[in-house]
């Protein structure tokens, strides 16, 4: 059973849904990229089939180099077999048309999940299986017993909290050394950039 209050500004609703296997600043692979990205593709491809919707897309991320050193580091990494699945340093005409940068650019093989398509489709699927409840979730209503957990008449063996930034306020998790962070929204409009 998924319990969700439909919070309009939850991270899932406003996130871009992007994945990027490379840390830009240090030009290193993201943690467990070699394991997690194949699992991401496999899982979302299966969900596309289940929901009969298209919502996972591969998309290259353009990295403009701030210096010759950054360009050299990128080209060296792109030639390294450990990074070859993620980095591309071949010229691309559609990028060349808009990227007027003296040190050049490289591309990172990333992508995104179209969350405005995925989230409502998955929500409807869960509703069709009687596995979704739109409701506030109050931790004080949780009761633990020998067979698992009970909440407002629903019983389960386990409970998974997916509270996002509200985890800090949780009576169960407030001891964790978490700090609030925030993302930024950036809307880009550029003539000739046909992505």
Describe the role of every protein-language-model region:
Residues 144-195:
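Flavin-dependent oxidoreductases
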Residues 1:
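N-terminal Rossmann-like FAD-binding beta1-loop-alpha1 element of flavoenzymes
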Residues 5-57, 72:
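Conserved FAD-binding subdomain of flavin-dependent enzymes
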Residues 15-18, 34, 77-79, 173-177:
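Short, glycine/charged-enriched secondary-structure capping and boundary segments
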């Amino acid at each position: 059973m998924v319990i969700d209050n439909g919070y309009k500004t939850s991270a899932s609703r406003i996130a871009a849904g992007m994945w990027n296997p490379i840390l830009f600043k240090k030009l290193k692979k993201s943690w467990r990229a070699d394991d997690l990205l194949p699992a991401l593709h496999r899982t979302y491809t299966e969900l596309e089939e289940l929901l009969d919707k298209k919502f996972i897309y591969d998309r290259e991320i353009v990295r403009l180099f701030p210096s010759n050193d950054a360009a050299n580091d990128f080209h060296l990494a792109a030639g390294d077999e450990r990074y070859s699945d993620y980095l591309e340093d071949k010229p691309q005409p559609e990028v060349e048309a808009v990227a007027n940068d003296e040190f050049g650019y490289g591309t990172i093989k990333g992508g995104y999940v179209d969350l405005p398509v995925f989230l409502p489709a998955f929500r409807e699927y869960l509703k069709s299986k009687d596995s979704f409840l739109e409701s506030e979730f109050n931790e004080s209503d949780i009761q633990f017993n020998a067979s698992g957990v009970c909440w407002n008449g629903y019983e389960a063996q386990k409970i998974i909290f997916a509270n996002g930034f509200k985890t800090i306020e949780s009576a169960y998790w407030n001891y964790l050394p978490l700090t609030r962070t925030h993302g930024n929204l950036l809307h880009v409009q550029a003539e000739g950039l046909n992505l």
